[in-house]
Amino acid sequence: MSGREGGKKKPLKQPKKSNKDMDEDEIAFKQKQKEDQKKLDEMKGKAAQKGPLTGGGIKKSGKK
């Protein structure tokens, strides 16, 4: 038995599944996810413009 034969055998690669067999519900779900992601990105952009929300809390002096 040579050194190359030892170890775990790799399984044969499976062919990729085609995404052509999606029904209307899956297509609608994907479209809704894209729209939600766009809205989330817009909200992130607006939040970044306004600056941090903190600043009114208790401030620590840093001294001990």
UniProtKB/Swiss-Prot annotation:
Residues 27-45 have a biased composition (Basic and acidic residues). Residues 53-64 have a biased composition (Gly residues). Residues 21-50 form a coiled coil. It comes from the Eukaryota. Signal peptide: none annotated. Residues 1-64 are annotated as: Disordered. Keywords: Coiled coil. Belongs to the TMA7 family. This is Translation machinery-associated protein 7. It comes from Xenopus tropicalis (Western clawed frog).
